[in-house]
Amino acid sequence: MAKRDYYEVLGISKSASADEIKKAYRKLSKQYHPDINKEAGADEKFKEISEAYEVLSDSQKRAQYDQYGHVDPNQGFGGGAGGGFSGGGFSGFEDIFDTFFGGGGRQQDPNAPRQGSDLQYTMRLKFKEAVFGKDAEIEIPREENCDTCHGSGAKPGTTPEKCSHCGGKGSINVEQNTPFGRVVNKRTCQYCNGTGKEIKEKCSTCHGKGRVTKTKKIKVKVPAGVNDGQQMRVSGEGEAGINGGPNGDLYVVFVVIPDEFFEREADDIYVEVPITFVQATLGDEIDVPTVHGKVRLKIPSGTQTGTTFRLRGKGVPHLRGNGTGDQHVIVKVIVPKKLDDKQKEILREFASTTGDRVDEQTSGFFDKMKRAFKGD
């Protein structure tokens, strides 16, 4: 089944800005997150949304996607728990240079130490876990050197021999006719797969590979203030190096589960709090939830719906450096839908005492609305 266009998945245009991409992702992820949406297919929809955001939120991946579209999973845009990083490279150009120049100067020693592959792990965090951080233990499937043969691939007591086909070089010369004449092309030796070694008696544990897949438990300290889509490198926790080379690294990518009440923008938090029209008119003090605990907020008399109050220092700790963001409280005045006769009479009496007048600010709003209708 063909993948949908990432821009279509997020419901945005191809010219969308980074902020528009982020807003679209937050809206959709909140709508389809499996912890919130229990409908059939919500989980797959959420994965599709997350994949689209992972690519389009990264300028380099987005540019590659805009140019080439969906590519083979082994050649980029990798992801998922424990999934490795890989790149497409320039193999096509290398083949051309190999053909005309015989691959001269690019041959590498097959026995030289090489760094192991990097790994990627996706960690899902609750909203408050991302705000305050946490200590976590994760399990990573990765390739490690075989303990039985110590990575040689040979049966204990034996050693790998030099490949008899390539002489230990890991490559062989192949003559090829081209429009420019006969050239010599270097190809990876198919008998030793480029290792330059030949194993007569293979290790019974790894079957000659020298590596086995193991599940490793790793402790990860999630820093306070981490945001959705950010990643953290755990040095040396990738796959084992080859020929004594260093291990690769592990990259932990954070996916923050949207909260049903708190909304985050950078290190600030936004919430909507309902108040009654009586509280808005006469003023009051209300309790407002924050990630740091309950806070008492004074509502001045005459507060209008949409008014925003700032609670300083009640947001998200800065990931780099000291300080904390703020929480913005947006009040929504709730008008009662059902009133009994006595309540209606009280309101009518109130209206008669005011003469149905509106204050200057409200008058100004209606004047602007009238001018808009007239086209002034």
UniProtKB/Swiss-Prot annotation:
Keywords: Chaperone, Cytoplasm, DNA replication, Metal-binding, Repeat, Stress response, Zinc, Zinc-finger
HAMAP family the record matches: DnaJ
Major localization listed first in the record, in broad terms: cytoplasm
Complex formation: Homodimer.
Cofactor field: Zn(2+)
Keyword Nucleotide-binding: no
GO BP terms in the entry: chaperone cofactor-dependent protein refolding; DNA replication; protein refolding; response to heat
Binding site for Zn(2+) 1: 146, 149, 203, 206
Organism the protein comes from: Listeria welshimeri serovar 6b (strain ATCC 35897 / DSM 20650 / CCUG 15529 / CIP 8149 / NCTC 11857 / SLCC 5334 / V8)
GO molecular function, one term: zinc ion binding
Domain J as annotated: residue spans: 5-69
Subcellular location: Cytoplasm
CXXCXGXG motif repeats: 146-153, 163-170, 189-196, 203-210
Protein name: Chaperone protein DnaJ
Keyword Transport: no
Family: Belongs to the DnaJ family.
Chain positions recorded as Zn(2+) 2 binding sites: 163, 166, 189, 192
Cofactor note: Binds 2 Zn(2+) ions per monomer.
Role of this protein: Participates actively in the response to hyperosmotic and heat shock by preventing the aggregation of stress-denatured proteins and by disaggregating proteins, also in an autonomous, DnaK-independent fashion. Unfolded proteins bind initially to DnaJ; upon interaction with the DnaJ-bound protein, DnaK hydrolyzes its bound ATP, resulting in the formation of a stable complex. GrpE releases ADP from DnaK; ATP binding to DnaK triggers the release of the substrate protein, thus completing the reaction cycle.
Domain notes: The J domain is necessary and sufficient to stimulate DnaK ATPase activity. Zinc center 1 plays an important role in the autonomous, DnaK-independent chaperone activity of DnaJ. Zinc center 2 is essential for interaction with DnaK and for DnaJ activity.
Domain of life of the source: Bacteria
